Every structure is written in structure tokens, then in C-alpha cells.
């Protein structure tokens, strides 16, 4: 068996090959891309003709290079960069660092400590596609939120009437009116009929007349005014920001359609959607982040640990503390937090479990985290046994005093 450390960069890879005893067999720098992968395979073939006898350590689990390594049949371990940095300090504390040295470090790590790390999951291409779409969809939502916050901040500087007229600046009503009247002077010229026409063109069908009157009253109310030149400049930036948010709304809707199509064709989609609080979009996010490799999570605890919902115990001497995990998959944790919130409004068992934790003194987010932790365990059981969610089975034995789940 041979062990290879791969210290990757954007344009090249430094690799170090060693045997079971830690003896160096080869080391070199390979270019990124097809020629580099060919060189990698040539080095491997010289020392280990069987791909099963090749163990690789690398500080990423994504990209075409990693895909090529796993497709070749090598055992690939994605090691957290923080773990690599701590491992470096284990051998020397001088602070010295080099790409070639890090490659050797990674090879040593998977040679001696790979039992403490997980190999890259063997997820299907279908779930990888779902993850890409779900992350892209979420990225666009985060981008829209940033632009909406910037718009709100700008309107506070010169156009407070717009903030009084619209609670949600990313809503179609707000975008339609602000696109036509990006300054208070423009707003003063808007008649009720023009506002009504803009709302109708944006897609509103109900309460057109009453809503148009409300908007006109808010926009024409007396307010502090900026200098005309400043207001005009702000108006130009508002018009541009409104156009960006409107386009983001269209792209988010298109990605939702694409994501729903991919999710609904996945073999596990019915199981995910059977759980309370998981719809198409949220279910797709959770599925994409967990993956569909049936061997990745051997127990419910390992799935909970990866999700970051299970408590973390810190004990030393007579001291013992149970804390929340902060090193976690942020996207997955956020999705489970939303899932738990939705579940307590749809599942009597989840609601009762939440109420138990609140009654025991937990804060809202602590109780919500406990519900999310329990839901992850339920999901694991459903996937393991290939069965849909059942309310009675899931919660009948949990109507007791909460434990450290909410830490």
C-alpha cells in the first residue's frame, strides 16, 4: 500500500508518495488539469498497480481533480485544513511551511491517522447535481438579501416614504413602484391610476385600488428631503439596485424550478418529503448536503455530528460542560434550523418535544436545535429502513423529560 499527500493550488499539485514505513518513494509537482492527472496516474502505476492500494490525503472534497482521483478507484480522504495545521504543530512548532512539506504531512497523516478521518463519500451524480443547484439557489437568495439591505440603507438616506410604503423591498410591488419612481419627486407625480397599473403589470390581482391608495399616501406624506442633486444621485443607484433585485427574483424562480425537477426524480425524495416541515426546496438542500452514500453515516449519531445538531461535551478533571457545536456545515445546519421551525408547526410530536425543552428552561434556539437533532435521527432511521415518516413511531417514546440534546 502507498500513501500520497496532495497539496493543491489553483495551478499545480505538489505530491509526496511514501510506503507503509514512511519511506519516500517519489515527490514532484504536477500541473492542474488533464496532463497533471496523467502524470499522477503514471507515478501511482510505478509503485502500486492496484488502485485499492492507494490512499490519498488532500485538503478539499470538490473539483474535477478530486473527481478524477475517486473515479480511478483510489481511497481519497478530504482532510480539514485546520486539522492539517494542528497536525503540522504536532511535529514541529517553528512555523516553517512549504507546499512540498505539506504534501509530505498529508501523506503521513493518512498513513498513520486515517482511521480518524472519513474518506470522500461515494455520492451519486444525481445528488451532486442537487447540491450544486441547491447551493446556487441559496447563494442567489443571499445575494438578493445583500442588495435588498443596501437598498433599504440608501432609502433611509433620502426616501423614507418608500420604507413606509413597503415592508418587503424585494417584493414585486416595491420593485414595480421604485422602478418607476426612484426619488420622492418622481413619487409625487404618480397618480393612483399609474400606481394601480404598475401593480397590475407586476402581477398583483387583489386589492389593487386600496393598495394603490395606501402607497400613494405613504409616498406623498411629509418627510425630510435631501438636496435635489443628492436625491437624483441616490435615485440613479436605486434604479440600478431595483433592476438587479428584479433580475435576481427571476433567476431564483428559474433555479427553484430546476432544483425541484432534480429533487423529485431522486430515489430518496419521497422519504425526505414525508418528514414534517420538509418541502421541495428545503428537502433538496438537506439531501444535497447529506448526500446519498448509504455507507457514509454508519449511525444516527454520526449523521447528527456532521449536521452540527448534536451536543459537544467538554470534560476535564472535575469540570464538565455540554455545548453546541460551532464547527459544522453551515448550509446544512441552517437548513435543519429552518426544518425544525417548520416541523413544530406541522408535527404534534415535534411541537411537544419543543415545548418540553422550553419548559425545562431552554431558550428558543436551544429547543429548536434539540428538535432538529431529533429530526436528523428520525431521517437516518427512515433512510436506513427505506420507510416513510410515521408520526406515532417517531415520537411515541419521546414524551419524556428532555436531556442534553438542547445544549
Regions picked out by a protein language model, each given a short descriptive name:
Residues 1-407:
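A detector of single, family-specific signature residues
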